[in-house]
Amino acid sequence: MKRILVALDSSPCAPLVLSAADKLAELTGARLVVFRAVTVPPDMPRDVLLVSDLRLEDILTRNARGDLERLTRDVPPARLEKLVASFATPWDGICTAARNEAVDLIVIGSHGYGVLDRVLGTTAGKVVNHADRNVLVVRAAL
């Protein structure tokens, strides 16, 4: 195993998922590609969506990348290959990033933050069903 895609969201479980992936990378000598998909939050006020000088997509992606930088602060540089933030539907963005980055494994948390996850099925479940490579699902402490 050479490369692991770690799919993180903004939930409180993200550090646990990152820690599990980092331990696996340490044991296998793999490097981490840390990923976050961002979308427009459903509760975002409509007037924010009408920002003219700044593209909302760019703002959200830049903020997500900053979050990834903070989350990965304690990961040894030798194991951290890159950070990727993408404006995409989470499950599709994760599967696409895994292909584009040619990773050997996807590591994802079992429960995300989204309300839609409870209605339409979890992001983790969709990744497991659609990914063309192995997926390790990290279960949050109950």
Show which residues each predicted segment covers.
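Short, hinge-like loop/turn segments at secondary-structure boundaries
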Residues: L49-D53, N100-E101, A124-K126
